[in-house]
Amino acid sequence: PTLDEALPVVEQLDVVRRMLFCGADAKHLEGATRIRKALSVERAPPRGAVIELGVLPRLVELSSDPSSPELQFEAMWALTNVASGTTEDTAAVVAANAVPVMVSMLSAGVTDVVEQAVWALGNISGDSTPFRDLVLEAGALHAMCRLVTV
């Protein structure tokens, strides 16, 4: 799949979704990067549209692939941006089973990936008491303490 550079990414999210699911690793990275950039805009990031695409579980999967730290970083950053939205947005990230992956990324050893995992877990735990408890139960506090004692 290829994008029409003349159109905004938000108008081409279906093409971006296909990039994430195709067999080409380079397309996975391009798709994750495009979603992350679309979600990084200050005014009205398209969180709902990205959630409706059904790509959050795929972003979780890609963020746990140690063969490409750059892809891990982009996918985790996209998840971080979704989790920074409304409670419903954050719940979608949680429902995609992202929390255990994010906690495991705290020991990834790649600074950028670790930093994004910390941000994402902070966004999730800061949303509500139940989400905070979920993050704590997943072992995030112990993993983060290891980061500062290393």
What are these regions (language model features)?
Residues T2-V9, M19-C22, A26-E30, A38-G54, ...:
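Elongated alpha-helical scaffolds that mediate protein-protein interactions in large eukaryotic proteins
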Residues V15-R18, L56-E61, V101-V103, L121, ...:
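Buried hydrophobic core positions in alpha-solenoid tandem helical repeats
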Residues G23-D25, S67-S68, G109-V110:
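Short inter-helical turns and helix N-cap capping residues of alpha-solenoid HEAT/ARM repeat scaffolds
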Residues I35-K37, T80-N81, G122-N123, C145, ...:
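Structural signature of alpha-helical solenoid repeat scaffolds
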Residues D112-E115, A120-L134, A140-H142:
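Alpha-helical scaffolds that organize eukaryotic protein assemblies
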